């Protein structure tokens, strides 16, 4: 009995010390050396935020740790070459790396769940050692890295997915991704980037800039914008897409085919402009556009046989010799309710705001391209939709 009298309090005290050594909620733990990291090797779970000191040099490994109940971050660690955590399976908050300019290895073979990913300025990081793959994350932002692919990012759902300025990035295939609750954005990556989202069925906003291929065969509906600027793919197909917000195809130099056979509703503006190789626009199921229809270019055919309601402006101009008869009738029958213009065989086709509708137009409409792009303002938003106007302005700035 006497032994128990003293042993039990001692054991409790030892447990308290061990718990304290594994961090506390809202505490920041600074790791300045491998010995600092080894001090937590007896911890299955570390509580609080782990910050890797920017002055640390070489490799750092977190052995035996399975869970971080906070953030794992490093900012400005210019001499850190490797970060590893062989057994870590979850980071509850943010996995943040910024300015690790010599980092070549990121080894987290057991990691499957992250609160969010924020990686910026990791130019020497060419691949990920994420064997199991991260299948759960809130927002993912990856900017200015040397990654050639995103193998190891195997998300089922995501909030924002923002992939920009990764100039070595050749391919992205997020096979398991089914839903996105925030913006999906690709911009400024390698011009030959191919994006495959084979099982994505729903989302909010999706924007693609300077990509060579986009595959979204399962996409069914978007609540926000779907936009393409300056891409180099020849064909875009969304066979199951029925509804989206603003829809934009702007300055895609090689685009010859747009296939959206199931599209019925555009909740916003619908802009097709400056796609000089596009000769035909066929939208067999389109019924409703709540914003403006604004098509300009070099196309010879335009077909929207089921069109029932265009609430905004209708501008259709092309160098091609198509017929306006169907759309004249739709305007007279009040199917098209806004300001109406349809012009075939127009040498200098323009958008509804006067910007050039082709990349080779000359004369007044060509010079109008810059001035009118610069004049986009809130007065234009109700007809075309905010996101489409914003996208057009961004493309002009770029």
UniProtKB/Swiss-Prot annotation:
Glycans are attached at residues 79, 179, 199, 205, 210, 221, 240, 257, 321. GO terms for cellular component: fungal-type cell wall; plasma membrane; side of membrane. InterPro entries: CWI-Assembly_Regulator, LRR_5, LRR_dom_sf. Residues 1-19 form the signal peptide. A lipid is attached at residue 372 (GPI-like-anchor amidated asparagine). Its main location: membrane. It is found in: Cell membrane. Residues 373-398 form a propeptide. It is a lipid-anchor; GPI-anchor. Pfam families: Ecm33, LRR_5. Keywords: Cell membrane, Glycoprotein, GPI-anchor, Lipoprotein, Membrane, Signal. The GPI-like anchor contains a phosphoceramide lipid group. The anchor position has not been determined. Residues 344-369 are annotated as: Disordered. SUPFAM superfamilies: L domain-like (SSF52058). It comes from the Eukaryota. Residues 349-369 have a biased composition (Low complexity). The keyword Isomerase does not apply. Gene3D superfamilies: Ribonuclease Inhibitor (3.80.10.10). Involved in conidial and mycelial cell wall biogenesis. Belongs to the SPS2 family. This is Protein ecm33. It comes from Aspergillus fumigatus (strain ATCC MYA-4609 / CBS 101355 / FGSC A1100 / Af293) (Neosartorya fumigata).
């Amino acid at each position: 009995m006497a032994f128990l009298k003293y042993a039990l309090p001692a054991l409790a005290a030892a447990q308290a010390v061990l718990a304290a050594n594994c961090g506390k909620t809202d505490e920041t733990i600074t790791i300045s050396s491998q010995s600092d990291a080894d001090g937590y090797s007896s911890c299955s779970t570390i509580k609080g935020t782990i910050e890797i000191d920017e002055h640390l040099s070489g490799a750092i490994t977190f052995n035996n740790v399975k869970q971080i109940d906070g953030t794992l971050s490093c900012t400005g660690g210019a001499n850190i070459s490797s970060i590893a955590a062989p057994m870590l399976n979850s980071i509850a908050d943010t996995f943040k790396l910024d300015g690790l300019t010599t980092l070549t290895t990121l080894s987290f073979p057991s990691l499957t769940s992250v609160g969010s990913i924020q990686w910026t300025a990791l130019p020497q990081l060419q691949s990920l050692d994420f064997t199991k793959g991260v299948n759960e994350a809130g927002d993912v932002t990856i900017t200015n890295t040397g990654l050639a692919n995103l193998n190891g990012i195997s998300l089922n759902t995501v909030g924002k997915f923002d992939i920009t300025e990764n100039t070595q990035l050749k391919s992205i295939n997020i096979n398991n991704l089914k839903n996105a609750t925030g913006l999906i954005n690709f911009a400024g990556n390698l011009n030959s980037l191919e994006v495959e989202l084979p099982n994505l069925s729903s989302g909010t906003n999706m924007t693609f800039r300077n990509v060579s291929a986009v595959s979204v065969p399962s996409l069914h509906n978007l609540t926000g914008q779907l936009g393409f600027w300056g891409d180099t793919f020849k064909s875009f197909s969304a066979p199951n897409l029925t509804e989206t917000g603003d829809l934009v195809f702007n300055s895609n130099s090689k685009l010859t085919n747009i296939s959206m056979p199931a599209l019925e509703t555009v909740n916003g503006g619908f802009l097709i402009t400056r796609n000089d190789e596009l000769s035909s626009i066929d939208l067999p199921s389109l019924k409703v556009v709540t914003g403006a229809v604004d098509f300009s270019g070099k196309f010879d055919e335009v077909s929207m046989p089921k069109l029932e309601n265009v609430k905004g402006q209708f501008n259709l101009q092309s160098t091609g010799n198509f017929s306006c008869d169907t759309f004249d009738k739709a305007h007279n029958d009040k199917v098209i309710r806004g300001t109406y213009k349809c012009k075939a065989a127009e040498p200098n086709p323009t958008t509804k705001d006067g910007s050039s509708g082709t990349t080779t137009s000359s004369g007044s409409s060509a010079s109008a391209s810059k001035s009118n792009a610069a004049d986009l303002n809130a007065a234009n938003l109700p007809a075309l939709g905010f996101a489409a106007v914003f996208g057009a302005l961004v493309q002009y700035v770029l």
